[in-house]
Swiss-Prot record:
Family: Belongs to the universal ribosomal protein uS17 family.
InterPro entries: NA-bd_OB-fold (IPR012340), Ribosomal_uS17 (IPR000266), Ribosomal_uS17_bact/chlr (IPR019984)
GO MF, one example: structural constituent of ribosome
Membrane-spanning segments: none
Organism from which the protein derives: Brucella canis (strain ATCC 23365 / NCTC 10854 / RM-666)
Pfam families in UniProt: Ribosomal_S17 (PF00366)
Quaternary context: Part of the 30S ribosomal subunit.
Function: One of the primary rRNA binding proteins, it binds specifically to the 5'-end of 16S ribosomal RNA.
Keyword rRNA-binding: yes
CDD domains cross-referenced by the UniProt entry: Ribosomal_uS17 (cd00364)
The protein, known as: Small ribosomal subunit protein uS17
Length: 80
């Protein structure tokens, strides 16, 4: 089964070798007939501490690295 890849924005880089990535998804609400934005934060492994707050990154699912980390940062995307 392929590993999931998500895109999001780094919102915290205070932990060693860890960044917190906020991933936003949009969906149509069945009753309100509106587009709703929902976000979720994922802790992702950043081996070299190279990503900073505000960077747009791709994260990939991985085997558990710690209690909360199950994602690895792949690449930094051009924000835009």
């Amino acid at each position: 089964m392929p590993k999931r890849v998500l895109q999001g924005v780094v919102v915290s880089d205070k932990n060693d070798k860890t960044v917190v990535v906020k991933v936003e998804r949009r969906y149509s609400h069945p009753l309100l007939q509106k587009t709703v934005r929902q976000s979720k934060k994922y802790k992702a492994h950043d081996e070299n501490n190279q990503f900073k707050v505000g960077d747009f990154v791709s994260i990939q699912e991985s085997a558990p690295i710690s209690k909360d980390k199950r994602w690895v940062v792949l690449t930094s995307e051009a924000a835009g």
